[in-house]
Amino acid sequence: MKKKIILTLMLGICLPIVAQQVDEINLKEVEVKAARFVLKPDGRLIFPSDAQKNASTSGFSLINKLALPGIRVDETLRTVTSIRQEGTVQLRINGIIATKEELLSMEPKAVKSIHFIDQPGIRYGTDVAFVIDIRVQKAANGYVLGFDGVNSVTTYNGDNSFYYNANHNNSEIGVTYDFGYNDFRGERTDEAARYELVDGSLYTVQRNDETARNRYFGHCIQLKYNLADSASYVFQTRLSTAFSRMPDNNSVCQITTPTQSYKAFSEQKDKDFTPILDLYFFRDLGKHQSVTANMVGTFIRTDLESSYNEGAPYAYSVAGNSYSLIGEAIYENRLKPFLLSLGFNGSLKYTRNSYQKDVSLTDNLHHESVYCFAEIKGKLFGANYTADIGVSNQRYRQDENRYNYWLWRPKLTLSYPFLKVFNVKYGFEMSEHMSQMANISRAEIRQNSMEWTVGNPELRPYKRTSHTFSLDFEQPRISSGIKMEYRINSNCSMDKYVRTADNRFLYSKTNQQNINMLYVNNYTRWDMVPEKLSVMVFGGIYRFFNQGDDYRHYHTSYNYGANVQAYLNQWTIMGYADNGWEFIEGEHLNRNHSTIYLSVSYRVGAFEIGLFCQHPFRKNPIMNSSKVLNRYLNKETFYRNSSFGNMISLNFAWKFTKGRQYKQMQRTMNNKDTDTGILK
């Protein structure tokens, strides 16, 4: 009777988090063995084929071969992004957020399954579009030593990783080192701007880069110790230190106005130092109960110098320090009719950024957050459900500016399988979003002779409400899905342009009416020759509604693409192409232009050699473009980079293992901080 009362109360309120160890309760999901995945309320559980695992050298390589809908993988730059830029793609290994080094050093053959979540709840953080959780077996004994490097032969760009992991009984130690670099000299920005001045006249400016150089060097070393008995406890500590440097990024720009033509010079130097300590603990309490805790401490040191000379010198420097502490605890009880989860997440952050020279001020930003939640998950009347209730609080103060923002956050996901090949799903969520810390700075940064970027200390968090509906069709060799979502961002952070009496154009962010989006998309995958040749195509239509205090902007865009994969013994051949992604947010119309990736790799024993080509047959591709649609300022900008045109990179991977034996492992946490709060 007590369990029935709990179930009734939770379903009556229906509010948020996300699944923990979702495969530990029998929901009688739709399973299609030949298709190697199981549909779940929040996504799907994928079982990679032996051909996919054998042809992969790292986590990035394996994710790329899965051809996940809405996901773009760049094996050269070691990035996984959302095609539609809905938010970040969160990568995990056994439930814990994974670093790039861990994804490179993981052994694809030890992968049991991959949980692809396309409706992540707030349990995974804010602005997360997808979660990819790779579940691997933990090695009981032996060691692995390896190297994975991608280096371009047509430009100065690369990323190289060395790793070592050793296991003995319940203990594991790991060391990884990563070095990345680039020196791009083919970047060019072309900009045409039209300003309406106070007297009603129009003033036009053409800005065209003549030369530009962008250099980056990054080092990261990570130490990890893990002590685990998969039946009762897990303890893990991870210490990492990252150091990056941009020694001298500069450009020379030709500026043309109705009365004169002259050159402008810009230069920027940047150094970052980021140590992170991550502690994780899991304990099985018995009687289907468990508790999980995680704590992450981060320090970010930033030194930035920027200068711009457009007839008169302008320069500023920033010395920034950011301290943050994030803690989380979750209690789970696997009751017979449902899985109950109760949790708490809290964070403390202090940021001090001191601006010098032409910008003279010090930002002292204090931010605290608390989030409490409860979740149940089970099966009722043939439908799988996940129902959540939670409340969050965000607090911020900076001198006399402060806010105290509370929000109830409900989330409900229902899915129903029928006719053995179909699954229909509905999701509702109310979540909280906040702008980057840099946007609430008190700084005012000059961009050129006409424009300034201004922080807004009065910016507040805002509420997002989303409704999603999807229908999936699954057969042994073909799968297809259609998804529709309507997203409402109320009183959200939107663009604000102000024209001053002396004809300066100030850009900032303010809370305004709403930004809404409606879209419908589809993906279809066909295994033409099982485990040998597969094709995936996707497409969608998107409608955007932007309603500011003094403007209205609407836009419709289309997105489509395809992915082809072929496995021929030791050879793997892949091709990917899409038409890019266009969206409007506030008064900016942005477009990421079309992309083509081609790759071929050959594997023999512990070695693999691969060849990657980006933007083939394009000498100087447009990477992205944007338009400013303000009534006083109209501007169109194109960013090109010839370094990426016909870009060819070589991948060499070597992995040596000895005495590796595996046992299954499951973990469930994610916390980190990367926001410096610096306005640029």
Question: What is each PLM-predicted segment?
Answer:
Residues Q20-Q52, S61, T76-L77:
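Short, acidic, small-residue-rich periplasmic hinge/interaction motif at the N-terminus
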Residues E29, G59-N64, R78-T81, E101, ...:
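N-terminal periplasmic accessory domains that precede
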Residues N94-I122, F162:
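Short acidic/polar hinge/loop motifs at secondary-structure boundaries
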Residues Y403, F422, E432-G481, S508-L518, ...:
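Outer-membrane beta-barrel signature, preferentially recognizing the C-terminal barrel domain
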